Amino acid sequence: MKEGSPLTISALPQVEYRQGTVVKHDGYEIIDHWFQVPLTHGLIFSKGRDAALSSRFADQSIKIFAREVINTSETLTLPVEKRPYIVYLQGGPGFGSPKTGSIGGWIAELAKTHRVILLDQRGTGMSSPLSARNITAVGDPQIQAEYVELFRADSIIADAEAIREVLLASRKDKRWSTIGQ
């Protein structure tokens, strides 16, 4: 979006979901998940719903990528459909989640008891990037600052909550655990 005045809309864009590639490899099922989430929904946590709806970016959404790792070994005592979810939040600065080419270490251990979600937080990995090109394309420095503000922790948590609601929609218990570094 180029320079312009803030707008007010009645509702943020809806969260959209698409399951991507499913790969079975070495006793694991790896599922790619793609989401479109409102660019401004994190503002609800920090500044309130009115701020999210009146932002100049309120009508925009961004892509969020998450990869699910499921241990499919039949020797595990808890069936896949009963395993709780755990989402991994990569610390910073600005890196995507670990790759799953060779699963080992903490991911392998957690996958014995959980469905592990590796979240590429907004601006990182395979999610919509936060790059110099994207930032300068939105307008003058004031508008750029407003845009970058939408990639803070409150927005990452709003994204994680939207993902949780989609992935756990059919479950009675909609809780999940988080882990990060």
Map each language-model feature to its residues:
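Catalytic-loop region of hydrolases
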Residues: 1-123, 133-134, 176
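Short, flexible, mixed-charge acidic loops at enzyme active sites
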Residues: 129-140
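Donor nucleotide-activated moiety binding/catalytic core segment of transferases
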Residues: 35, 151, 160
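Short glycine/proline- and acidic residue-enriched helix-loop micro-motifs
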Residues: 141-150
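Short beta-strand immediately N-terminal to the catalytic nucleophile in serine-hydrolase-like folds
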Residues: 178-180
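Periplasmic/extracellular electron-transfer cofactor-ligation site
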Residues: 126
